[in-house]
Amino acid sequence: MVYILSEQLIESTPEYVLKKDIPAVFFITEEELPYILEKLKISFEREYKIDDVYFCKAESLQDCIFGTLYIPKLLDILGSRFRLMFFINARHIVIVDNSGFALRILNRIKRRKIHQGGTKAKFMYNFMTEFMATDSELLERYEHRLMNLE
């Protein structure tokens, strides 16, 4: 799926976005990654598998920022986690996800936010704050439990 970055995210096609050179966010699976990176002219020389993601990081490469996100599932904090990779270049964001988690976050942004992503920075801010939204509530519950144990 591809969405044009504007105040309201607009669904589009990769062909249209690439032809018009419009800033956009791509939600893809690992299988689609080589094709999309080639089309966006993002050179990524290492072989990276989404199953190899075990922590959150971001690194600056020659023509993009590459990052990984390793996000705990709220109902199973110590168990399995969502694994994402992202690439950000001058015009586009590519989010790689095999689980559907990123699309669920996108749908929440579209439902809850008025200013959904006029810029790459605004979109990434919305994306990250959306999956961290309940973290403070969860931490507060743990804090209360710890205080009760004292």
Question: Where are these predicted regions, by residue range?
Answer:
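Short amphipathic alpha-helical segments, especially helix-boundary/capping motifs
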Residues: 9-15, 119, 123-127
